[in-house]
Amino acid sequence: MSKIIGIDLGTTNSCVAIMDGKTPKVIENAEGARTTPSVVAFLEDGERLVGQPAKRQAVTNPTNTLFAIKRLIGRNFADPVVAKDKAMVPYEIVKGPTGDAWVKAHGKDYSPQEVSAFILQKMKEAAESHLGEPVTKAVITVPAYFNDAQRQATKDAGKIAGLEVLRIINEPTAAALAYGLEMNEGKKIAVYDLGGGTFDVSVLEIGDGVFEVKSTNGDTFLGGEDFDLRIVDYLADEFKKEQGVDLRKDKLALQRLREEAEKAKKELSSTAQYEVNLPFISMNASGPLHLNIKLSRSKLEALVEDLITRTIGPCEQALKDAGLKKSDIDEVILVGGMSRMPKVQQAVQDFFGREPHKGVNPDEVVALGAAVQAGVLQGDVKDVLLLDVTPLTLGIETLGGVFTPLIERNTTIPTKRSQTFSTADDNQSAVTIRAFQGERPMAVDNKFLGQFDLQGIPPAPRGVPQIEVTFDIDANGIVNVHAKDKATNKEHSIRIQANGGLSDADIERMVKEAEANKASDEKKKALVEAKNQGEAIVHSTEKAFAEHGDKIGGAEKTAIETGLTDLKAALEGEDVEAIQAKTQALIQASMKLGEAMYGAQQGADGGEEAAHDDGVVDAEFEEVDDSKPSA
């Protein structure tokens, strides 16, 4: 059975891990790094870059370099948070075929699921390279506060990448799994997870292998990217005051600002001041303009103070929902790159009244937890029971547009709940079931999940028909809805498909495109390797031919010259098999040349040995018998 891998698909960085015996272990990527930037770039010639290579070229190719794509996954184009993102990224966010947010690169539209799949493929390839076998199954993490549409979209991304997603697991829960794997005594812990694009807080009770999530809360549009944007705005405003030029209108300058903002934010976690220095950032009539601004830690803290404060409300709500006081929490675990910021750590300490635990790597702990869950599913990890919850209330729209809950938030999953409803009008023959997710009293203010019709209800006065509606949430947090007319036993059920989500046909097409791209990428790689080998053989043969060509016969010389000409011609083209064949032909033709070189070397060595014979001393050796006693 092939290994199940654990993947943390992050907004800024992603990470992959496996169970190595009883211990989860992070796998390094092709560049030798333990985390991979969640960045995808498309070049002019159609080549696609993923991870660090994509991030490195972002400044010179800002409109075709896609990052923070997780903030768009499962979101409608009309969503206000998408409009906010649209104004702040150099690439184009467009309306997809079904109204959801897509992105454009080199004139082609991509769904966030497809872009996420490119990142997942990179993780999959790293695992396959490490394990030396194909990988087809994975556990993928998502923010605890992701709704059904976002969870389904993440699962679809896995499918496009060629992975069967066995489980979607919440990021704070995964972190708790990694933290508490060896823990025997009972503890109540809070996981504060401030990542690149999302914030979650979960309260759990752990001990004796049981991980029970008591509550979860968060904000799926609050993270390190927002901190970066505050720095970008500050730098752009200061530059505009001094030079009268708004750098936000220049996509290349904006990308340089973003990169420098991220660097400044990281540096200011360990230093008191950072000098932002961007020469030739813009031009005016007088010539080039340079940006040079000193940014202090205190200034950064002032810029982002309200963002940090926004994380405290969900912490209060999570404690309230869990029925716990701050003093009941035994440990606070910090997760996500932004939790390294001293001001964030101080805010957490001030709220919970205890110093947070810093013994886990905030960039890797989520992937490690995903690997633990993978180990549980594989049967390698015993005696671990994970009881997670649904983050948002689920219900349907009833008369007057009211949101009627069926499953309250923080209900342990998997779960199933039923409730009986009736018709609103006399002789109504069909009802439309409209499912929503959220906490607002009116349905329209919550996240619309989907709808279906239950037809063929017998004519009856309003209020008489009995229609049973059942919500079913699986262990991934994905919703199914079922409606049944009790009089006729007619029923209808659907797996909720996000309004604007990918259809099965879309996913199938994207899977095929991903496979085709993989084949194309492998072909390009094979061509590069064949050309490298061919060019190396040409170089070494020409060098040897120049030095030792006079030591071989005319027929061998002709064969080598022909071989060189043929291989050089093949190297001009892109036929891998032709290059490989001509390379082998030249290797065969130059074997006599190799013998001549070897003979010349032997002769040189022989002369050297003769020269040293004068210094050789003859000696007699006695064979030692180990059985004889030593003196």
UniProtKB/Swiss-Prot annotation:
<dbReference type="InterPro" id="IPR018181">
    <property type="entry name" value="Heat_shock_70_CS"/>
</dbReference>
<feature type="modified residue" description="Phosphothreonine; by autocatalysis">
    <location>
        <position position="198"/>
    </location>
</feature>
<dbReference type="InterPro" id="IPR029048">
    <property type="entry name" value="HSP70_C_sf"/>
</dbReference>
<dbReference type="InterPro" id="IPR012725">
    <property type="entry name" value="Chaperone_DnaK"/>
</dbReference>
<keyword id="KW-0143">Chaperone</keyword>
<keyword id="KW-0346">Stress response</keyword>
<keyword id="KW-0547">Nucleotide-binding</keyword>
<dbReference type="InterPro" id="IPR029047">
    <property type="entry name" value="HSP70_peptide-bd_sf"/>
</dbReference>
<comment type="similarity">
    <text>Belongs to the heat shock protein 70 family.</text>
</comment>
<dbReference type="GO" id="GO:0005524">
    <property type="term" value="F:ATP binding"/>
</dbReference>
<keyword id="KW-0067">ATP-binding</keyword>
<dbReference type="InterPro" id="IPR043129">
    <property type="entry name" value="ATPase_NBD"/>
</dbReference>
<keyword id="KW-0597">Phosphoprotein</keyword>
<dbReference type="GO" id="GO:0140662">
    <property type="term" value="F:ATP-dependent protein folding chaperone"/>
</dbReference>
<dbReference type="Pfam" id="PF00012">
    <property type="entry name" value="HSP70"/>
</dbReference>
<protein>
    <recommendedName>
        <fullName>Chaperone protein DnaK</fullName>
    </recommendedName>
</protein>
<dbReference type="InterPro" id="IPR013126">
    <property type="entry name" value="Hsp_70_fam"/>
</dbReference>
<dbReference type="GO" id="GO:0051082">
    <property type="term" value="F:unfolded protein binding"/>
</dbReference>
<comment type="function">
    <text>Acts as a chaperone.</text>
</comment>
